[in-house]
């Protein structure tokens, strides 16, 4: 687990996390890690290849450890009892593909959002942007729900499923880039009718934001305002920033003029559609933060800095170049700001017009909102084309792009709608909008920094070292 970057110092008086040192938790972690190499991708264990007498004691250790820890989580009594039952059922099936639907339905963290409330989470699951296999994982976490955030959620940004959280400790599936705990990742016999919660680790978001942004600012010679600099030095303040960003972003997926299912979970679309949707949610957050700042909210300006810096510096150069929709969204924001004179790259230094940047950022948000509203009256292929035209006004497509050649090059001779949509998606290059020369250079310089944030948390972080 990587808690520190080379540029961040350890806080000498960091509080001890007692449950993370509890003997039962340590036994639970060890048993989970011993089970990991025995499990297949779907979470099952092949007893023709692994001796059962090797597996049974490990699962028994998990069950007894959960039972020993359960009194620390009286609010999760029904859930932890269901975990024990699901583990027993898994053993009874001969460790076939695990089914933890009963325990998933019993775990309802959104029903009790209390600041500092702790949860023990045990599920067979994959971790988004982390481990793709449904291994058994265990996480100790804390809910972040300060009164000011609860008041905003009650009165302005209703989001009953949103659960901001921080890590206390975790198994290897979270020693990755994953910053979310989502119910849809859990191994179940059938998906619930609806999901009722979603957890986002604001400490991981804040810590990697601070590390990457601090290094990017130094590399690019960017002069930033004093309040932005102090944000980068304060882990707790950055976490408060991200819980507000996440609250508004997450809510925005289901608000506005939406020509499609807001999360597009069951739809296949060209990847720029996902990129525009995520960017729309972030730019809406930025726009709301501008308004909140005018009303005196103390976190609102920090949210504006965070959206700009994370979108401009981390998103475009994180991950691979295969349908990297978040990277595309970050490039689009940079190009839009650049073409509208809100930022400049001259003499090997980046400069931002801090007065103009909010206006231009909100203008890009307005362009995407117009695209969405117009899309309600368009057939799907026409909407995809309009979105491509918006993106390609600011980002240069790959020279070999079929889409860039126009509708004449696309397979509109197909008359079956499903076949046409599939062919249009198949015509998209994996890297339809390659990195600009600016981002190619930045990627080489930041790649090591970004790699160092794998598994990062807020534990033990204080100010940025000089």
Sequence positions of predicted segments:
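Post-HEXXH active-site segment of zinc metalloproteases
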Residues: 257-279
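Active-site recognition of the HExxH zinc-binding catalytic motif
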Residues: 242-258
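Short pre-active-site segment immediately N-terminal to the catalytic Zn-binding motif
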Residues: 228-245
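Long, well-structured alpha-helical subdomains associated
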Residues: 6-13, 17, 239, 286, ...
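An active-site-proximal "capping" alpha-helix that borders the catalytic cofactor pocket
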Residues: 274-290
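Non-catalytic terminal regions of proteins
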Residues: 2-190, 194, 359-466
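Acidic, low-complexity proline/glycine-rich segments
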Residues: 204-219
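Conserved helix-loop functional segments at active or binding sites
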Residues: 253, 257-261, 287-294
């Amino acid at each position: 687990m990587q808690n520190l970057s080379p540029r961040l110092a350890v806080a000498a008086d960091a509080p001890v996390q007692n449950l993370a040192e509890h003997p039962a938790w340590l036994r639970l972690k060890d048993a989970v890690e011993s089970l990991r190499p025995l499990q297949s991708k779907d979470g099952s264990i092949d007893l023709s290849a692994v001796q059962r007498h090797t597996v049974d004691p490990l699962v028994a250790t998990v069950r007894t450890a959960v039972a020993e820890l359960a009194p620390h989580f009286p609010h999760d009594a029904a859930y932890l009892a269901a975990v024990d039952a699901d583990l027993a059922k898994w053993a009874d099936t001969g460790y076939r593909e695990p089914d933890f639907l009963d325990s998933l339905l019993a775990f309802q963290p959104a029903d009790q959002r209390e600041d500092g409330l702790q949860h023990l989470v045990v599920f067979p699951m994959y971790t988004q942007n982390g481990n793709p296999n449904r291994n058994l994982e265990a996480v100790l976490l804390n809910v972040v729900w300060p009164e000011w955030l609860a008041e905003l959620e009650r009165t302005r940004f209703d989001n009953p499923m949103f659960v901001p959280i921080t890590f206390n400790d975790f198994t290897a599936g979270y020693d990755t880039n994953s910053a979310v705990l989502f119910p849809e990742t859990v191994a179940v016999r059938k998906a619930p009718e609806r999901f009722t919660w979603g957890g986002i680790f604001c400490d991981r978001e804040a810590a990697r934001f601070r590390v990457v942004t601090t290094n990017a600012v130094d590399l690019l010679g960017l002069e930033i305002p004093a309040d932005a600099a102090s944000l980068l030095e304060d882990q707790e303040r950055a976490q408060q920033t991200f819980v507000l960003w996440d609250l508004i972003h997450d809510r925005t997926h289901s608000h506005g003029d939406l020509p499609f299912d807001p999360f597009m979970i069951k739809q296949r679309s060209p990847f720029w559609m996902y990129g525009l949707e995520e960017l729309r949610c972030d730019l809406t957050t930025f726009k709301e933060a501008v308004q909140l700042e005018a009303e005196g909210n103390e976190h609102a300006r920090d949210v504006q800095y965070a959206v700009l810096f994370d979108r401009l510096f981390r998103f475009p150069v994180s991950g691979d170049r295969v349908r990297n929709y978040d990277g595309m969204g970050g490039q689009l924001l940079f190009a839009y700001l650049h073409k509208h004179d809100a930022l400049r790259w001259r003499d090997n230094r980046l400069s931002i017009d801090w007065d103009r940047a909010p206006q231009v950022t909100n203008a890009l948000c307005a362009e995407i909102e117009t695209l969405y509203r117009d899309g309600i009256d368009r057939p799907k292929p026409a909407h995809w084309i309009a979105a491509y035209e918006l993106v390609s006004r600011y980002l240069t497509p790959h020279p070999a792009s079929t889409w860039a050649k126009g509708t004449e090059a696309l397979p509109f001779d197909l008359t079956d709608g499903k076949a046409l949509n599939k062919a249009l998606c198949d015509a998209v290059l994996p890297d339809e909008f390659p990195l600009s020369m600016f981002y190619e250079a930045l990627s080489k310089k930041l790649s090591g920094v970004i790699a160092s944030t794998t598994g990062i948390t807020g534990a033990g972080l204080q100010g940025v070292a000089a």
